[in-house]
UniProtKB/Swiss-Prot annotation:
GO cellular component, one term: cytoplasm
Tissues of expression: Expressed in tissues surrounding vascular bundles in hypocotyl of 2-week-old plants.
Organism encoding this protein: Arabidopsis thaliana (Mouse-ear cress)
Family to which this protein belongs: Belongs to the phosphatidylethanolamine-binding protein family.
Protein purpose: May form complexes with phosphorylated ligands by interfering with kinases and their effectors. Can substitute for TERMINAL FLOWER 1 (in vitro).
Domain of life: Eukaryota
GO biological process: negative regulation of flower development; vegetative to reproductive phase transition of meristem
Keywords for this protein: Cytoplasm
InterPro entries given in the database record: PEBP (IPR008914), PEBP-like_sf (IPR036610), PEBP_euk (IPR035810), Phosphatidylethanolamine-bd_CS (IPR001858)
Signal sequence, renumbered to the chain: none
Localisation per UniProt entry: Cytoplasm
Protein name, UniProt field: Protein CENTRORADIALIS-like
SS bond partners: none
Presence of the UniProt keyword Cytoplasm in the record: yes
Length: 175
């Protein structure tokens, strides 16, 4: 009899659609507007995620460096994501035990704007082999591939991941 996984990254199909697995070896927190922490599978509205969040790395040390990737695997819509993935943000060279403000932003934050259906927005944290090791930078955001990016930059599997769901807001909701 097959075992049903309770891992939210498997249930939410982040593992499978975006990455092959996640080591979950480092703790990462993502917080919008200083009080809206991202939890796997929770819904956040576009008005809450307009500005880049604070992303903290609770692991490694000042000699360990990490790369953060934020992506939307449900483009243009979750029922037919033929443009998978859309890249929203990349920050490299983040020292362990700090936050993304200490890293190097190579692709600026783009706020989520889902048009069709409920989209997953995925934060992935990769451990770098050394500072400055991320050299292959995507030239465009559309049809980004997290697996290829990780492979090209020798990042391996993510050491932390979290995702939230987001859908288009009605005008009444934004008030």
């Amino acid at each position: 009899m097959a075992r049903i996984s309770s891992d939210p990254l498997m249930v939410g199909r982040v593992i499978g659609d975006v990455v092959d697995n996640c080591l979950q070896a480092v703790k990462m927190t993502v917080t919008y507007n200083s009080d809206k922490q991202v939890y796997n599978g929770h819904e956040l509205f576009p008005s809450v995620v307009t500005y880049k969040p604070k992303v903290e790395v609770h692991g490694g040390d000042m000699r360990s460096f990490f790369t953060l990737v934020m992506t939307d695997p449900d483009v243009p819509g979750p029922s037919d994501p033929y443009l998978r993935e859309h890249l929203h943000w990349i920050v490299t060279d983040i020292p362990g035990t700090t936050d993304v403000s200490f890293g190097k932003e190579i692709i600026g934050y783009e706020m989520p704007r889902p048009n069709i259906g409920i989209h997953r927005f995925v934060y992935l944290l990769f451990k770098q082999t050394r500072r400055g090791s991320v050299v292959s930078v995507p030239s465009y955001r559309d049809q980004f591939n997290t697996r290829e990016f990780a492979h090209e930059n020798d990042l391996g599997l993510p050491v932390a991941a979290v995702f939230f769901n987001c859908q288009r807001e009605t005008a009444a909701r934004r008030r």
